[in-house]
């Protein structure tokens, strides 16, 4: 007799206008199994998981857990059934603290008023112990101590450098991703859905997470692990299901297939895992930053006396652990953040603390780390997003009128050239309709189409599939060949080494180390990224000169 799978999804169908996202998909997950879910962006993975989490209702098909058929009309239904989910796109409230976001929606018991408690200590004993007062405390969080201690312990346990009392808006993308992971770890679940959970984690942090997942599965928790990183599939996944164009291509044991096999299942063709970086002689400097210092959104110094020179036809890779000043450096170079000291020139023109528009007009293009928040307008059409920085150009109209025919043709050309999928009509499809990888390709297409002198790319391949990664990396190297200076910020060390001509390591807002791909030592770079290099102080003193003169 065949044992009933812990989770069974049968013949799941979900269609949106113009596209069938899930076409009769079957998925089974065993108890205590880490089950991988692979597929290109737009293959239907997120849609399938949103159905399982009650965010979407399937058009057809059935879902059962432990043999019991489920009706999931809302996330609360899923939570009540013991299903938790970490979303790829953040679902946080910026004005709340980390701890408040983690416990949001939890039915926390009220903390009784105590004579020695800060909250309610001034009330008489009869009032503090009154059942009605305690009930109101539970309903309205009166006197409720937010369980920050447990959340902080979780954060420390998994190596998350995060203050759980900080407001979410004060955090960078990497730290916000960790809050999402904490939200899932905080709850006891039978089935945990992880949608790209390690996208912004360091290898060490990812290893800690993997250890925790294995402990969870030892306790009988089942995990669906959505990832684009094939090495993660090999490391932690027991079986993997591959989706392509909304259909189930197959389910295989990871021990029976190679990375190349999985990649070919995902995209339907052989995928190249290395890039051909042809030799290009760097030209004149296009960017010079001298003794640049800047503060973060909280007014705390994030950059300290950074020197950086980028030449035409050169890719300068910036490596570092999230939260060490990379975000602020990218925004300074793109004109989105003012400097507190130092100067910045582009093609010899002083742009220190100039407006973002001035940077754009002087040939600076920018791919931000958060494509949804800073790189696009989700409610606007693909057409509008494709020309977002260029409405002033004569080809798109004159005065207060716009040539929508030209705008449409421009967007369609970019969609075709960069293989942006899921767009049947650029005037109807919105940026918010696109999957992460396709939105990233649209943003990169927009920035490159401006023929920039300097391209600043911050985490350009974060959270995208192997096929999209291949095309994005090729596009960056094409810009290098055409004489564009490129600043590449990435937490993917292999990407930095493969694409860069020079590599700088940033730690606590300073450039502490410089090397080349030919001389790169991954262990040394990793140590420098965490401040553990034996010669960090010496290297820092030397490199502050090297970064500006190489």
Curated annotation (Swiss-Prot):
Membrane topology term: Peripheral membrane protein
Cellular component terms per the entry's GO annotation: plasma membrane
Pfam family, one: ABC_tran
UniProt xrefs under InterPro entries: AAA+_ATPase, ABC_carbohydrate_import_ATPase, ABC_transporter-like_ATP-bd, ABC_transporter-like_CS, P-loop_NTPase
Keywords: ATP-binding, Cell membrane, Membrane, Nucleotide-binding, Plasmid, Repeat, Sugar transport, Translocase, Transport
Function: Part of an ABC transporter complex involved in glucose import. Responsible for energy coupling to the transport system.
Entry similarity comment: Belongs to the ABC transporter superfamily.
Name of the featured protein: Glucose import ATP-binding protein TsgD13
Organism: Haloferax volcanii (strain ATCC 29605 / DSM 3757 / JCM 8879 / NBRC 14742 / NCIMB 2012 / VKM B-1768 / DS2) (Halobacterium volcanii)
């Amino acid at each position: 007799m065949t044992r009933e799978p812990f989770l069974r999804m049968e013949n799941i169908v979900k269609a949106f206008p113009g596209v069938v996202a899930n076409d009769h998909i079957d998925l089974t997950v065993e108890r205590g199994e880490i089950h991988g879910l692979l597929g290109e962006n737009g293959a239907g993975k997120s849609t399938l998981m949103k159905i399982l989490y009650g965010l979407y209702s399937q058009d057809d098909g059935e879902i059962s857990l432990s043999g019991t058929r489920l009706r999931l009309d809302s996330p609360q239904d899923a939570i009540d059934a013991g299903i938790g989910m970490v979303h790829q796109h953040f679902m946080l409230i910026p004005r709340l603290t980390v701890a408040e976001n983690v416990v949001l929606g939890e039915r926390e018991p009220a903390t009784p008023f105590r004579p020695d408690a800060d909250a309610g200590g001034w009330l008489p004993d009869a009032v503090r112990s009154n059942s009605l007062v305690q009930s109101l405390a539970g309903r309205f969080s009166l006197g409720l101590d937010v369980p920050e201690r447990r959340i902080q312990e979780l954060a420390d346990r998994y190596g998350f450098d995060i203050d759980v009392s900080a407001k979410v808006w004060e955090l960078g993308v990497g730290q916000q991703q960790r809050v999402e992971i904490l939200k899932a770890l905080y709850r006891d679940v039978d089935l945990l859905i992880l949608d790209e959970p390690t996208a912004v984690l360091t290898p060490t942090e990812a290893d800690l997470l993997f250890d925790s997942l294995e402990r969870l599965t030892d306790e009988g928790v089942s995990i669906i692990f959505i990832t684009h990183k094939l090495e993660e599939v090999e490391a932690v996944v027991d079986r993997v299901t591959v989706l392509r164009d909304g259909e189930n291509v197959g389910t295989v044991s990871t021990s029976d297939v190679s990375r190349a096999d999985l990649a070919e299942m995902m995209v339907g063709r052989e995928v190249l895992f290395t890039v051909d970086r042809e030799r290009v002689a760097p030209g004149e400097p296009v960017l010079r930053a001298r003794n640049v210092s800047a503060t973060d959104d909280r007014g705390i110094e994030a950059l300290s006396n950074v020197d950086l020179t980028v030449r035409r036809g050169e890719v300068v890779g910036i490596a570092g652990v999230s939260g060490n000043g990379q975000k602020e450096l990218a925004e300074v170079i793109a004109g989105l953040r003012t400097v507190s000291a130092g100067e910045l020139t582009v093609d010899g023109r002083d742009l220190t603390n100039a407006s973002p528009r001035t940077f754009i007009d002087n040939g600076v293009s920018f791919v931000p780390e958060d494509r949804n928040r800073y790189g696009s307008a989700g409610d606007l059409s693909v057409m509008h997003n494709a020309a977002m920085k260029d409405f002033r150009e004569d080809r798109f109209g004159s005065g207060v009128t716009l040539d929508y025919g030209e705008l449409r043709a421009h967007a369609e050309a970019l969609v075709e050239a960069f293989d942006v999928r899921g767009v049947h009509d650029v005037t109807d499809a919105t940026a918010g309709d696109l999957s992460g990888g396709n939105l990233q390709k649209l943003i990169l297409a927009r920035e490159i189409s401006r023929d920039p002198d300097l391209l600043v790319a911050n985490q350009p391949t974060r959270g995208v599939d192997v096929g999209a990664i291949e095309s994005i990396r090729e596009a960056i190297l094409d810009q290098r060949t055409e004489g564009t200076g490129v600043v590449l910020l990435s937490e993917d060390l292999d990407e930095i080494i493969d694409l860069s001509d020079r590599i700088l390591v940033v730690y606590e807002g300073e450039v502490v180390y410089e090397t080349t791909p030919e001389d790169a030592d991954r262990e040394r770079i990793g140590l420098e990224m965490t401040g553990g290099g034996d010669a960090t102080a010496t290297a820092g003193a030397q490199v502050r000169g090297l970064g500006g003169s190489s």
